[in-house]
C-alpha cells in the first residue's frame, strides 16, 4: 500500500523534478512534454536551482520551480502554478526573456544565444482551447511560419485533463495523470513503462520521505 504526496504541492514538485540525484525524472518529463525524439532528445541536464529543503516552514526557496540546461545549452523553465498569479502571461514572458538575454554580455554574441523553453503546469483554466496540452510559439500570423524558433511555451492545464488509468495513451497523458492524481492513488498504475516516470512515482511515495522533508511539505 503506497500513499503518494500531492505532486502539485510546492515542496513536492521541486523535490521530485528538481532532484539532483534523480535527473532521469526531469529528463523524461522534458522529452515527453516537448515531444523531443531522436537527436533532439535531452540526454543530460544541469539543474540551475537544485531542490533544497526550505529553512523555515512555509518559505518558498526559489521564484521558479525548476530551471535547467541541457548539453546543447538549451534552457528549460518548469513551473507548477496552483493559482493564477496576477499578470500571469507577463510573468511567463519575463522569466523566459530574462533567461534568454542573460546568456550573453554584449550584442556581438547574438549567434551564441540558445533556445529557452517554458513549461507551465496550471491548476486553473487559462486558454480557450479544449485540449489540456497547448503549444505556443512566435509565428507569422498569415502563414503560420515559425520564424523565431528560440522561444517556445508549452502548457498543461490540469482542469482539462480527465482521463482514467485505462485511457492513458501517450507518455504526456501518463505524466499529467501523475501530477494531477498521484495523491489519490494507492498504487502505481500498471502501464507505467517509462524509467523517469517510475522514478517519479517512487520519489512521490510517502514512505521515501524523511520526517524533515515531509514536515516541509505539510507546512508549505
Language model: regions and residue ranges:
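Elongated, amphipathic alpha-helical interaction scaffolds
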Residues: 1-220
Amino acid at each position: 500500500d503506497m500513499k503518494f504526496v500531492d505532486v502539485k504541492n510546492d515542496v513536492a514538485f521541486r523535490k521530485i523534478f528538481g532532484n539532483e540525484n534523480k535527473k532521469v525524472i526531469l529528463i523524461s518529463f522534458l522529452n515527453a512534454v516537448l515531444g523531443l525524439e531522436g537527436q533532439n532528445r535531452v540526454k543530460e541536464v544541469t539543474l540551475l536551482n537544485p531542490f533544497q529543503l526550505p529553512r523555515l516552514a512555509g518559505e518558498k526557496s526559489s521564484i521558479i520551480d525548476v530551471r535547467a540546461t541541457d548539453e546543447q545549452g538549451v534552457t528549460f523553465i518548469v513551473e507548477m502554478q496552483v493559482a493564477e498569479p496576477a499578470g500571469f502571461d507577463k510573468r511567463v514572458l519575463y522569466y523566459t526573456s530574462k533567461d534568454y538575454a542573460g546568456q550573453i554580455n554584449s550584442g556581438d554574441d547574438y549567434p551564441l544565444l540558445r533556445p529557452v523553453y517554458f513549461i507551465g503546469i496550471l491548476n486553473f483554466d487559462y486558454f480557450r482551447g479544449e485540449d489540456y496540452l497547448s503549444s505556443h510559439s512566435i509565428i507569422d500570423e498569415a502563414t503560420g511560419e515559425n520564424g523565431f524558433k528560440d522561444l517556445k511555451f508549452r502548457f498543461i492545464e490540469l482542469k482539462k485533463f480527465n482521463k482514467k488509468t485505462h485511457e492513458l495513451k501517450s507518455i504526456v497523458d501518463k505524466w499529467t495523470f501523475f501530477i494531477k492524481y498521484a495523491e489519490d492513488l494507492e498504487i502505481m498504475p500498471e502501464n507505467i513503462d517509462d524509467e523517469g516516470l517510475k522514478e517519479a512515482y517512487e520519489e512521490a511515495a510517502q514512505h521515501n520521505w524523511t520526517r524533515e522533508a515531509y514536515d516541509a511539505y505539510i507546512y508549505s
